[in-house]
Amino acid sequence: MTSKAVVFAYHDIGCTGIEALLNAGYEIAAVFTHADDPRENTFYASVARLCAERGIALHAPEDVNHPLWLERIRQLRPDFLFSFYYRRLLGAELLACAARGAYNLHGSLLPRYRGRAPANWVLVNGETQTGVTLHRMVERADAGPILAQQAVAIDPEDTALSLHGKLRKAAGALLRDSLPLLALGVLPEVEQDESQASHFGRRTAADGLLDWHRPARQLYDLVRAVTQPYPGAFCQVGEQKLIVWSAEVVAGNHGREPGSVLSCDPLRIACGEDSLVLRFGQRGERGLYLAGTQLATELGLVEGARLRGPASGPQRRTRVLILGVNGFIGNHLSERLLRDGRYEVHGMDIGSDAIERLKADPHFHFVEGDIGIHSEWLEYHVKKCDVILPLVAIATPIEYTRNPLRVFELDFEENLRIVRYCVKYGKRVVFPSTSEVYGMCQDPDFDEDRSNLVVGPINKQRWIYSVSKQLLDRVIWAYGQQGLRFTLFRPFNWMGPRLDRLESARIGSSRAITQLILHLVEGTPIRLVDGGAQKRCFTDVDDGIEALARIIDNRDGRCDGQIVNIGNPDNEASIRQLGEELLRQFEAHPLRAQFPPFAGFREVESRSFYGDGYQDVAHRKPSIENARRLLDWQPAIELRETIGKTLDFFLHEALREREAQA
């Protein structure tokens, strides 16, 4: 019986995959591809042309995961989906359309070099082997079980173009051997070894900058990784750009400074280790392709001259405005940015106890104040700074029912004013959305771009925080369509030192773990709301802040206009389990003897704890594919470690409180 396939394909290997399917006897019901980008050098074969010649139905939608396209694909009733160098991620609903599974051909030996541009990256990194992999598609990019692989040797003289040719041949051979077995259902699958996984993002022309302080071998690898048809490696000669198309490594650098011209015939440049002969290149984007010797003459180079790589002079630090700088995220983020050395942090908050350790840093500027009052200071600093983070918010569940109007006024109205200042002055805003916006969504994993945002009835006032944040997300998105640069990030239950204060927990206005620790410290029963069965995914603040710092860094602008969940799906636990692990570590803590005996667990109804208008959520687990793809980020800290350092912080705080009262 003929197997029916729907194919997602682009590039040479897209054509190779389509030809292989036809040769293996598959029926191709439709092909989805991309319209060629006029800004891109399309040196590869055309999937559109091939399909036209073969009489195959072809589509190029902007969003293949759109419900309209999902329904059309379902109506085709495919046995298989195949992706051959298609450039967009296929969502879970789309993958489920295939009765016998969805499969991707990836241009590396997975699990190494997941992600974008693997053929370029293996050359940049000096690898001697790569290959192609046929694997089952899962929601995580390039992470599904492997069905077949074929290795490809990388020769010292290979360029990205020659290596791509080798990969194309390997792909053809692998598919020729594998597709018939797949149709018969006899091709075994092997899970990927996550400990060996590596992930690489897309490359841009700016990544071709030559840093002469690096070893010549590394620069040679960069040149061959980005030479024609790619934009090329480059450096500066005075005010002129020199693009290098071909080079070779020569031993020694005569002890000269990196970037020094050692000779003009051949054109040889000293590197941090050894030297590089520039064989061919061109002046600027529109120059002629010339030999290195002629380039030296036309550029006016002489022995001893210096070529420039990355700017070596002092650069202005990026100014980051953090409103709510004394809060949990604000103080940890400030510390991380100041440690980086590339940022100047300006902050405002109504207190400063959590940032006292930062005040001595000359690049940290703090003003004590209220964003609702100090509007002139606020507008001036939005205008002055480069990146704006409005972190001021009421984010404790009991306040959602106790002070709903205050939640709306601060979390929506005051922050909307800040967003409008960003629009007015053309500033980038990194806005803290929340995992609460997903509400009672029933998806197993909450996806930023696909999950529905579901909240309860109007009389359940606990949702005022969720909808205030969601509405502001939508306003920011709408401003983004008019040119506002933004990123929305959604923290999932971040924990760590300085999360709250025990004093806040005493009045009920704190996060769950702080409330639990307060009960241990004071010897009162740990209250489990509705039995504590609710599950959350807890994220260590150090993991979360690292992701947020990468959003602020925004390499290649990849975070612009994006929504990013920041959470740890592997750290899922119920509130009861959280309490039990806290108790275990509390009993083993060196300070245990300083506190009263454990008073037990007590189950309470949510209404008695939070008051009328509360409604809870059974689970809240993030999809972190956007964070992996955009930030090359993966949370690493286990829950028990996070609980341990959070507990330790609050136990020491409790003793300090006791000493102060003595």
UniProtKB/Swiss-Prot annotation:
Its EC number is 2.1.2.13, 1.1.1.305. (6R)-10-formyltetrahydrofolate binds at residues 116, 138-142. UDP-alpha-D-glucuronate binds at residues 395, 400, 434-435, 462, 493, 527-536, 614. GO terms for cellular component: membrane. Keywords: Antibiotic resistance, Lipid A biosynthesis, Lipid biosynthesis, Lipid metabolism, Lipopolysaccharide biosynthesis, Multifunctional enzyme, NAD, Oxidoreductase, Transferase. Residues 1-307 are annotated as: Formyltransferase ArnAFT. The record marks 142 as: Raises pKa of active site His. Pathway: Nucleotide-sugar biosynthesis; UDP-4-deoxy-4-formamido-beta-L-arabinose biosynthesis; UDP-4-deoxy-4-formamido-beta-L-arabinose from UDP-alpha-D-glucuronate: step 1/3; Nucleotide-sugar biosynthesis; UDP-4-deoxy-4-formamido-beta-L-arabinose biosynthesis; UDP-4-deoxy-4-formamido-beta-L-arabinose from UDP-alpha-D-glucuronate: step 3/3; Bacterial outer membrane biogenesis; lipopolysaccharide biosynthesis. Coiled coil: none annotated. It catalyses: UDP-alpha-D-glucuronate + NAD(+) = UDP-beta-L-threo-pentopyranos-4-ulose + CO2 + NADH; UDP-4-amino-4-deoxy-beta-L-arabinose + (6R)-10-formyltetrahydrofolate = UDP-4-deoxy-4-formamido-beta-L-arabinose + (6S)-5,6,7,8-tetrahydrofolate + H(+). The record marks 104 as: Transition state stabilizer. Residues 316-662 are annotated as: Dehydrogenase ArnADH. GO terms for molecular function: carboxy-lyase activity; UDP-4-amino-4-deoxy-L-arabinose formyltransferase activity; UDP-glucuronate dehydrogenase activity. It comes from the Bacteria. The active site is at 106 (proton donor), 436 (proton acceptor), 620 (proton donor). NAD(+) binds at residues 349, 370-371. GO terms for biological process: lipid A biosynthetic process; lipopolysaccharide biosynthetic process; response to antibiotic. PANTHER family: BIFUNCTIONAL POLYMYXIN RESISTANCE PROTEIN ARNA (PTHR43245), UDP-D-APIOSE_UDP-D-XYLOSE SYNTHASE 2 (PTHR43245:SF13). Homohexamer, formed by a dimer of trimers. In the N-terminal section; belongs to the Fmt family. UDP-L-Ara4N formyltransferase subfamily. Bifunctional enzyme that catalyzes the oxidative decarboxylation of UDP-glucuronic acid (UDP-GlcUA) to UDP-4-keto-arabinose (UDP-Ara4O) and the addition of a formyl group to UDP-4-amino-4-deoxy-L-arabinose (UDP-L-Ara4N) to form UDP-L-4-formamido-arabinose (UDP-L-Ara4FN). The modified arabinose is attached to lipid A and is required for resistance to polymyxin and cationic antimicrobial peptides. This is Bifunctional polymyxin resistance protein ArnA. It comes from Pseudomonas paraeruginosa (strain DSM 24068 / PA7). The gene is arnA.
